[in-house]
Amino acid sequence: MRHFLNALSFAVVLLPATLCAAQIQGKVIRVLDGDTIEVLQEQQPVRVRLLNIDAPEKKQPFGRWSTNQLKALLAGQSVTVSYTQTDRYGRVLGRVITANGTEANRQQVLKGAAWVYDRYNTDNSLPALQREAQTQK
């Protein structure tokens, strides 16, 4: 019994971060590039970096195209952002879900508008989506 309680205590401490995720709900008021948006929550803009992906900067090849793909998906839309942390720039690192259930992070990869950020990726299904996008190009 003692071992069971120790194991249970250990498991509770190590619960996945997604179970403790916070949420932001609001309207996308700005798309900065292919992996960064601003969401208006309670009259305050919150900068959000799409988790697990990276996209070209606007001035890099395909940067404007990537930005336009994200604009087409999110501009003016109501979204829910699930997150567990912020980055060193104060941006929320999150999964962005539209009102109809589309996850923007995954869509950007599937369209070929962003790639999996291997160094920080925590979504094991994204590499397969990236391979699928590469075979369709």
PLM region spans:
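Small beta-barrel nucleic-acid-binding modules, primarily SNase/OB-fold domains
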Residues: R2-F10, T18-K137
